[in-house]
């Protein structure tokens, strides 16, 4: 099982955590939402729960709950800038389809 970060994503997460002044890493998960069934959840993590799995890449801890890892295994998190827009992008090999707006996906 693995979760990885691009250099751009790692730098952005470190900057967010430094600016926030606390936290053990980034919590990555999924929730039921949208027209395709599932959506990604990104939050700061202040604690690691017993059922969490912790992945470390480029000095950043990514914390994933036990249920979400089934949908996120092998995912690469990137941070991209396209014109005036910027944000995190998920390169998830488990996704079979995405909704037209890109906000949700199906595995």
UniProtKB/Swiss-Prot annotation:
Q: Which InterPro entries match?
A: Fe-S_cluster_asmbl/transfer, FeS_biogenesis, FeS_cluster_insertion, FeS_cluster_insertion_CS, HesB-like_dom_sf, IscA_proteobacteria
- Report residues binding Fe cation: 35, 99, 101
| PROSITE patterns per the UniProt record, alphabetical | HESB
UniProt-recorded Gene Ontology molecular function terms? 2 iron, 2 sulfur cluster binding; iron ion binding
Pfam families with a match to the protein in the record:
Fe-S_biosyn
- Tell me the cofactors it needs: Fe cation
What's in the GO CC field?
Answer: cytosol
| SUBUNIT field | Homodimer; may form tetramers and higher multimers.
Family to which the UniProt record says this protein belongs: Belongs to the HesB/IscA family.
Q: What else is known?
A: A transposon insertion between iscA and hscB prevents colonization of the nematode Steinernema carpocapsae. The insertion disrupts cotranscription of iscA and hscB but does not reduce hscBA expression, suggesting that coordinated expression of the isc-hsc-fdx locus is required for colonization.
Record protein name field: Iron-binding protein IscA
Q: What's the source species for this entry?
A: Xenorhabdus nematophila (strain ATCC 19061 / DSM 3370 / CCUG 14189 / LMG 1036 / NCIMB 9965 / AN6)
Q: Which gene encodes it?
A: iscA
